[in-house]
């Protein structure tokens, strides 16, 4: 044991000295540019970076991260010491995460248990969804909220249909409106929503609005002030004033939630902005998917919002008036389950449910996602499913909005294609849907991408659907999207140019950090 510790200490010290040497060379080389000519100052900088690199190396090692993440951070720090040092301070530090989110996790668990029904769904599940029993049990143990069989769901295709439904719903509000968004724009759509919220607030409707401080950093102060002055409570999620000193910058609220009077809700991939209506010159047509809910399951969506609200404001509003969603009677609705994922989860809830969905497949697995940075578990599950003869299809955009993620995603294509996965690139515009469909009777719609950031860092929310009418529309939409896509063929893809392979491999190396 002592020899092992000595070896670890020696390796970390060598790593720190290497980073320091790189730093010394870089600073010396650019000394004229940055105005440092005194050798003693260079020496002090070098010593400081030696100590910092050693301490960071120790922290990375002791955090017991996944080996790929540990190795990636050490490589980045070694090759790009200055960039790596500040990148780690911004995005890499993980040692306060447990303490930061421990209280929220406990409060969420208590609230979810308090409002989790005691109905025994087991007989109904076993009768209608025997092969998905494992998925139901897993969701229950991971802390997911109730499965509702008395909720109407409707798939909303693209921005026009989605925002027309949302605007109509906001106008119907009589008691309260709760909204939670990653990106809010001060443009035509944003202004239209703002005007409705102001009018509703004047009518006495309670309006609460959470927006992510980083995702909506371009949102004007006048937009926020106008809403606040009208009585709308507009609250930022994790505001960031000094990014380098604020480790919250890496944990963002990626959720998109609208709740109207506690009985109607919306969740999915669309943020608030004109580009989501296809009005961006670069992207053009914007392909996205949202879900409308009416009935019992809206209570689960409400709980997720109210717990986020309490986390940011300290205002506890778990009152019965907000949690009285009415069941929609009928035997044909199918099952709906809302699942919250985030850095406050002990288990990576959404990732594990994706994995269980893939593992439960008997005929088909269809995935639409704008970003594909899977971890080893998801990647292996998809390859094994394809090798077993299951129809595995992956639909992605043909043009990037984030080049690093785009090329890193493509680095996974060769091994997937070799295993028999069919990969398509959507060419009509930009594909932003976050959809998983298994065997045409099990699906997920939500905010979580098929990437490590959604699995580990972002606050997300997904609706898992079991044999609902909305799944049938999802299946048809997916088929329609394939008509607007081109299939990537394995032979042709393996012949792509060398510089593309190098770019993809380079970004693949950084994929644990993306």
UniProtKB/Swiss-Prot annotation:
One Pfam family this sequence matches: PLDc_2
Residue positions of the active site: 254, 256, 261, 432, 434, 439
Transmembrane segments: 7-27, 41-61, 71-91
Record keywords: Cell membrane, Lipid biosynthesis, Lipid metabolism, Membrane, Phospholipid biosynthesis, Phospholipid metabolism, Repeat, Transferase, Transmembrane, Transmembrane helix
GO biological process: one example: cardiolipin biosynthetic process
Catalytic reaction equation(s): 2 a 1,2-diacyl-sn-glycero-3-phospho-(1'-sn-glycerol) = a cardiolipin + glycerol
GO CC, alphabetical: plasma membrane
InterPro entries: Cardiolipin_synth_Firmi (IPR030874), Cardiolipin_synthase (IPR022924), CLS_N (IPR027379), PLD-like_dom (IPR025202), PLipase_D/transphosphatidylase (IPR001736)
PLD phosphodiesterase domain: residues covered: 249-276, 427-454
Recorded topology in the membrane: Multi-pass membrane protein
Chief localisation class: membrane
Molecular function GO labels: cardiolipin synthase activity
Localization per Swiss-Prot or TrEMBL: Cell membrane
UniProt keyword Glycoprotein, yes or no: no
KW Protein biosynthesis (keyword) present: no
Gene3D superfamilies: Endonuclease Chain A
EC code: 2.7.8.-
Enzyme class, spelled out: transferase
Protein purpose: Catalyzes the reversible phosphatidyl group transfer from one phosphatidylglycerol molecule to another to form cardiolipin (CL) (diphosphatidylglycerol) and glycerol.
Protein family membership: Belongs to the phospholipase D family. Cardiolipin synthase subfamily.
Official protein name in the record: Cardiolipin synthase 2
